[in-house]
Amino acid sequence: MELKNLIIKTLKEEVVPAMGCTEPVAVALGCAKAKELLGDMDITKAEILVSPNIYKNGLSVGIPNTNEVGLFIAGALGIVAGKSEKDLQVLSGIVEEDVVIAHELLKEEKVTIDIKPTIEKIYVEVNLYAEEGSSTAIIQGRHNEFVYLAQSGNILLNGLQEATSSTKSTNPLFEMKIRDIIKEISELGMDEIGFMLEGLEMNEKIAMEGLKNTSGISVGRTIYENIQKGILADDLMNTAMMLTAAGSDARMSGIRMPVMSSSGSGNNGLTAILPILAYHKKFPVEDRPLAQALAISHMTNSYIKHYIGRLSALCGCGVAAGTGASISIAWLMGADAEKIDGTIKNMIGNLSGMICDGAKVGCALKLATSASAAIQSALLALNGHVIPSKNGIIGDTAEDTIKNLGILSEEGMYFADHTILKVMKAMEGV
């Protein structure tokens, strides 16, 4: 496939709208599909098995159209009212009556959720049982990728693969140099990547909601209020922090609005897009370079997550999406290939130690940190200041550095991930 077409195809697959945090959404989507396979039969039991990472990210995050958090209500709503054709927006259209029925399902203890002992990062298995039959739906590898479907013992789809520590795409883009991907994107026209601007508009709306209303722990709104008081400067860095955090404040509290996700994560989408919006507000950019910058950001996020995993013990918003935003801003400011490589090294050298301890309202603080580091790393590189190679995990090239980060994520953070989950489960009394 021609390089530009592969880039466009990848962007269209990886940059899609999502309603709610994508881990509980994946559970709801699996439940919705399993219920559709079961038809009108009355459910006697719903057995849900998820990977440790899905469990971790779904434990404390708000669910749209409810005032609740967690996988149980997400799964129950998927059974009661989810429509699988809505994909990652499966929870859109939920009404109060649906929530009441979902509560009845949970009260009757018909829904169970357990952790499946798998090293697969993204895995959701839903088994529904009725007096007259049963159904199974399994999602693996991506939040919306069904790999197994069965209806009363009849297998309808079987694409299950043996779990690996990270389900890596065979996309040849991720073996290329990032500078070559950027060069190709810089030649694309609006007719080819103009759709990138849809995500900018979508994520700006949710950021504005986070600024207008008290949601989550109000990280973005607090920055805004202190800018208004003159305590903080109304500059690029604070605007990037404010907008990015505000989007997460709203989203993690379960706001009934979609976000444009990136590589399977809504918060990654916010982090990949909103610092660029902040730059655009301070230093207006024409539509074409703006769309190109967004494409660079999303492609870089996908590139890094190819190596660290779509879910991991590292905060993908910080080290992947934040790096995408950072090099996009550097590119808009005229950075050449060497300075873009330097920006990547600065970001990874800064935020490689940021852990993921699940999706929750506190993520807004991490997104603010990532947005701030994105501006700082770009400005440092533009001024010729880059972390030297062999300082820690920083390699000779940007790609070497990303691969080193991947080794850290897959090998070094394996036990850290289990320890994080152990601590979280202990606090939940599980």
From Swiss-Prot:
Q: Which GO biological process annotations does it have?
A: L-cysteine catabolic process to pyruvate
Q: Which InterPro entries match?
A: Ser_deHydtase-like_asu, UPF0597
For this chain, the family text in UniProt reads: Belongs to the UPF0597 family.
Species this chain originates from = Alkaliphilus oremlandii (strain OhILAs) (Clostridium oremlandii (strain OhILAs))
Q: Which Pfam families match?
A: SDH_alpha
What are the recorded GO MF terms, alphabetically?
Answer: L-cysteine desulfhydrase activity
Name of the protein in its database record: UPF0597 protein Clos_2050
